[in-house]
Amino acid sequence: LPHSRNSLYKLDLQTMAIDTIWEKAPYVNQAAFSPDGKQLLVAGAGDAFDGIGRNIKQGQISNSYDGQLFLYDLASRKASPLTKDFNPNVIDAVWNRFNGQIYILCEDEDYQRIYTCDPANGKIKQVAASEDIIMSYALADNAPVLFYYGQSASNANRLYAYDLKGGKNRLVYDLSQDKLKDIALGEVHDWNFKSDDGTTIQGRYYLPPHFDPNKKYPMIVYYYGGTSPTNRALEMRYSMHM
């Protein structure tokens, strides 16, 4: 059963006439106009619009926390899945007015990454950001510039400007340098293993500062079996370095 149902209406600000786009639709979370106003970029679960975004095996139950994107044509009142074959979980998306591309913030394994999607053909590619966890981003309306800030396993937030044409990052402000000025952190390494059913479980381990491989240290094991992974951010409710 859906957690909620949502209705969407379009209000003509000149005549104040209301057009009902949909009523009490399940698994639909939000919508925004395309730059030309002819389509909607809709965020929801795979079960939205009668399940057209589902990509699961027969007998499996769809995960409503797996965020998906849809294009909704206002003339035909028909939706089409945009990220059905895209594995990461969609957190947020913006349809850029400058170049017509859709920029998607995703939960991708234990990373948070930005991807760009061409709505004309559905092709999705990763933006080469400089941090493991992108916290937030913003796009210029009239220039090929994306600003974002984020952090990684051993640094706090840094602010960058990203050239959409050249694909290059420019560090604007390093807050991490100020916050970690007097703090020593140990090394972080990836550590993956395969479960009994063959699934690769991705993990990592954190060494204490000034680690001596000839000494023995206590080990704390942290694991989480929920819908979202424990990501690689330095600053979280349970900072792994701490």
Regions found by a protein language model. Give the residues of each.
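A flexible loop/linker signature enriched in serine peptidases of the S9 family
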Residues: 1-8, 22-29, 43-70, 81-90, ...
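Short loop/turn segments that connect beta-strands within beta-propeller blades
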Residues: 12-16, 73-77, 118-122, 163-167
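Generic detector of contiguous secondary-structure segments
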Residues: 15-39, 67, 151-158, 186-190, ...
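Beta-propeller fold detector
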Residues: 19-22, 80-84, 125-129, 169-176
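Conserved beta-strand position repeated across blades of beta-propeller domains
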Residues: 32, 94-96, 138
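Residue-level detector of Asp-centered blade-edge/turn motifs that repeat once per structural unit
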Residues: 35-36, 97-99, 141-142
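Hydrophobic beta-strand positions that form the internal "hydrophobic ladder"
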Residues: 37-40, 101-103, 146-147
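Serine-hydrolase catalytic core recognition
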Residues: 136-242
